[in-house]
Amino acid sequence: MNINDYLTYSATVTKENNFYIIKINSLEQETCTEDKDKIEYFAKSLILDYAESMIFLKRPIKPNKIKSQDNLLINMEYDFALKCMIRNIMYETTTRPSELASLLNISKQSVNNILNLKKKTNLDTLALCFNVLKRPLTIEA
């Protein structure tokens, strides 16, 4: 699992009538806006909504596998990417949030706050999640 797969998503933007259609290629999701200046904002919102819906449905969050310089590249936060990776590890290992809470010796509500995609979380806390899931976080240059 590579953080870069969750950091940058490729989007295609087409103009139809007065709307800009934004498609996140690897996720097969799309949205639209009338405001050209809000394209990146709507693209990020679409990626975030997609990830949250996958968490709700208890499915893995797809990484970006389509990398093309011809398309608009949407840069997500490192916090978002790490949380997607943790959620996917939990999915692979069938680890429930309550089990992660037990491993971390904290409440389930605290785990939900840590893994909330809309809240920022300290890198040390996220690294601890990787450790207790037996997939230590490694950073290479």
PLM feature segments, named:
Residues 8-10, 19, 69, 73, ...:
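Broad gene-expression machinery/nucleic-acid interaction feature
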Residues 34-35, 42-43, 75-76, 135, ...:
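Alpha-helix boundary/interfacial micro-motifs
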Residues 1-58:
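DNA-contacting interfaces and partner/effector-binding or oligomerization modules
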Residues 1-7, 45-109, 113, 119, ...:
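Short, charged, surface-exposed hinge/linker loops at domain edges
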Residues 124-140:
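DNA major-groove recognition helix of helix-turn-helix/homeodomain DNA-binding modules
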